[in-house]
Swiss-Prot record:
Keywords assigned: Heme, Iron, Metal-binding, Oxygen transport, Transport
Family membership noted in the UniProt record: Belongs to the globin family.
Function: Involved in oxygen transport from gills to the various peripheral tissues.
Protein name: Hemoglobin cathodic subunit beta
Classification via PROSITE patterns: GLOBIN
């Protein structure tokens, strides 16, 4: 993937506005609530019986931070996102058996959380660059599946 200087700047600037400890848990909780079948990968997380339980679940919050922390690696390695996520892709495929479509669902939920949080600070032209970035990350995470 080729990134223009403007796209790189947009992603870096947007990332600087993201509070990992806030956005990560919200994005993962949204996935688990909106797409309840994704809960099967989190059987050890305890009570995921309803939206309030998911949003108040400390393990969901902690893993949401981990997920967003991993996303930061892509921000810092935009020229080699696939290489950056090679081992993580392999883990999710071979050990965790995660359906790769779930990465797209998480990206969509993350985008919704960002749009909600940033409001007017997340106009369509910034979302377009963000969507490209998320698509590259999803592709990289899905690489070991095919």
């Amino acid at each position: 993937v080729e990134w223009s200087a403007s796209e790189r700047s947009t992603i870096t600037s947007l990332w600087g506005k993201i509070n990992v400890a806030e956005i990560g848990p919200q994005a993962l909780a949204r996935v688990l609530i909106v797409y309840p079948w994704t809960q099967r990968y989190f059987g050890k997380f305890g009570d995921l019986s309803n939206a309030a339980a998911i949003q108040g679940n400390a393990k969901v919050a902690a893993h949401g931070k981990v997920v967003l922390g991993a996303l930061e690696k892509a921000v810092k390695n935009m020229d080699d996102v696939k290489g950056t996520y090679s081992k993580l892709s392999q883990l999710h495929n071979e050990k965790l058996n995660v359906d790769p479509d779930n990465f797209r669902l998480l990206g969509d939920c993350l985008t919704i959380v960002l749009a909600t949080k940033l409001g007017a600070g997340f106009p369509a032209e910034i979302q377009a660059v963000w969507q490209k970035f998320v698509a590259v990350v999803v592709s990289a995470l899905s690489k070991q599946y095919f």
